[in-house]
Amino acid sequence: MSRLDRSRYASLYGPTVGDRIRLADTDLFIEVTEDRSRGPGLAGSGDEAVFGGGKVIRESMGQSRATRAQGAPDLVITGAVVLDHWGVIKADVGIRDGRIVALGKAGNPDTMDGVHPDLVIGPGTEIIAGNGKILTAGAVDCHVHLICPQQVPEALGAGITTLIGGGTGPAEGTKATTVTPGSWNLARMLSAMDDWPVNIVLLGKGNTVNDESMWEQLRAGAAGFKLHEDWGTTPAAIDACLRVADAAGVQVALHSDTLNEAGFVEDTLAAIAGRAIHAYHTEGAGGGHAPDIITVAAAANVLPSSTNPTRPHTVNTLDEHLDMLMVCHHLNPSVPEDLAFAESRIRPSTIAAEDILHDLGAISMIGSDSQAMGRIGEVVLRTWQTAHVMKRRRGALPGDGPADNARARRYVAKYTICPAVAHGLDAQIGSVEPGKLADLVVYDPAFFGVRPSLVLKGGFVAWAAMGDANASIPTPQPVLPRPMWGAARGPAAASSLTFVSPAAISDGLPERLGLATPVVPVEDVRRRGKADLPENTATPDIRVDPDTFTVSIDGEAVEADPVRELPMAQRYFLF
């Protein structure tokens, strides 16, 4: 019996157990720990489901006679390396009715051993060759200012399939505060998002002590609230908003009081009173109690996130932040008080500590802050740049060795399952698991985290790296991220979800607005805490010196040491 060496096997079928894969040009490697696509034992080798001329998936060979009515999947992605919060495995991934049905071995049970019963390939099954590729869940951007519709193509081209945030366009309120305020604006934005192949979670304005004004927004389609200092994040407003959120079962996102006008970080934590809350840009450059908002990452009830302009700490990070602040918060550089406000938020010591807290799993999520001090197309990229910098600085995480699976699982969770859990979306999205919407991203390993090869929305290709449409084959230059058939209006709506509060469902919102996109309620998140955020549950002791702004984590002071060079940068981008 002839045997294949590892190199030859990988070239035919993709890497298998024990093989390591470099992520883009970083120092990070993942190792395949299980291969479900091979079949039972070593005898399964050579019996993998592979598509192409003279290959396996042909009539009466790897393709069975099973009809769709008999359970054949609509799509199988063959031999992909799945990177998710729960592990790194190789599998064939089956999709039916837009949802993942199984991860295992696909093929024809009449001719092949070990075929998963939900992965029986039939004449109605499409194939995507995932062999040699990396597959992740679609990214969830947990901090989106909906300033312009052009953000959506940028997001999709970077592998983002879910947007959490708010806005109405380039209004001053939207440019600063991530809020879609009031029932009229919510109806307009829900209608506007109906045409795009993304899931949407709109946040209403929580800065009020009037309960009915918040319930009105919940009935109108808000799936949570945003508390923002530009609208006045006082202890009274925090308490009132959380009281309504507790009753409604929705999440609250917090941008606290940078100027400490209505209280200090201790007063905000007292107003939160142990209740679940999502703390945006926890480091503070994006806003929040100066200089010590970062200490909230130690609280078990606080679900902390970062926004991407401070990820990771580089020699250019501080310089770009001042101008961003002046624009985004409608400040005047000629007014000394406005300038002091901006400068108070930019601290190298807390930005440096943010790197460490991410690597510890103490800051659990990363979002963009799109066009409002953040870049929607760089959520995934900057997450992995941070992981690379931390490996170089801190070495392997516990459990890692030649490969970095523990670190990779922690960092992929920051933009997939963790924001999904935080906002009550995880029953539908956020991971590569059976039953969930097939929002999936396929990467060539050399471009991992930089540019996807394919972005699937609800099991249908919505975006892809595609060459000249007038060429004789799909690959001639220029190869650009382009919309595919899944981005057309009909499949875009059918393949996506609009998340709203349970109160909106009870009030008849889906029927009232007549949206084409399926409308589903968020899960109750009020009893969720950091312990529920996979791979990102740490609650270290965090202290900030009020005079020097030095941050100590579990008693150890963090020294600012910004990096001068990053991977996933000039090798891939001209600008």
UniProtKB/Swiss-Prot annotation:
Database matches in InterPro entries: Amidohydro-rel (IPR006680), Metal-dep_hydrolase_composite (IPR011059), Metal_Hydrolase (IPR032466), Urease_alpha_N_dom (IPR011612), Urease_alpha_subunit (IPR050112), Urease_AS (IPR017950), Urease_asu (IPR005848), Urease_asu_c (IPR017951)
Protein name: Urease subunit alpha
Enzyme class: hydrolase
PTM comment text: Carboxylation allows a single lysine to coordinate two nickel ions.
Positions of Ni(2+) 1 binding: H143, H145, K226, D369
Enzyme Commission numbers on file: 3.5.1.5
Record keywords, A-Z: Cytoplasm, Hydrolase, Metal-binding, Nickel
Catalysed reaction, written as an equation: urea + 2 H2O + H(+) = hydrogencarbonate + 2 NH4(+)
SUPFAM superfamilies the UniProt entry points to: Composite domain of metallo-dependent hydrolases, Metallo-dependent hydrolases
Subcellular localization, as worded in the UniProt entry: Cytoplasm
Signal peptide: none
Pathway(s) it belongs to: Nitrogen metabolism; urea degradation; CO(2) and NH(3) from urea (urease route): step 1/1
Cofactor note: Binds 2 nickel ions per subunit.
GO terms of biological process kind: urea catabolic process
Domain named Urease: residues: 138-575
Active site positions, chain numbering: H329 (proton donor)
Coiled-coil segments: none
Species this chain originates from: Frankia alni (strain DSM 45986 / CECT 9034 / ACN14a)
GO CC, alphabetical: cytoplasm
Chain positions recorded as substrate binding sites: H228
Gene assigned in the entry: ureC
Subunit structure: Heterotrimer of UreA (gamma), UreB (beta) and UreC (alpha) subunits. Three heterotrimers associate to form the active enzyme.
Family named by the database record: Belongs to the metallo-dependent hydrolases superfamily. Urease alpha subunit family.
GO molecular function ontology, one term from the record: nickel cation binding
Sites bearing N6-carboxylysine, chain numbering: K226
Main location: cytoplasm
Cofactors named for this entry: Ni cation
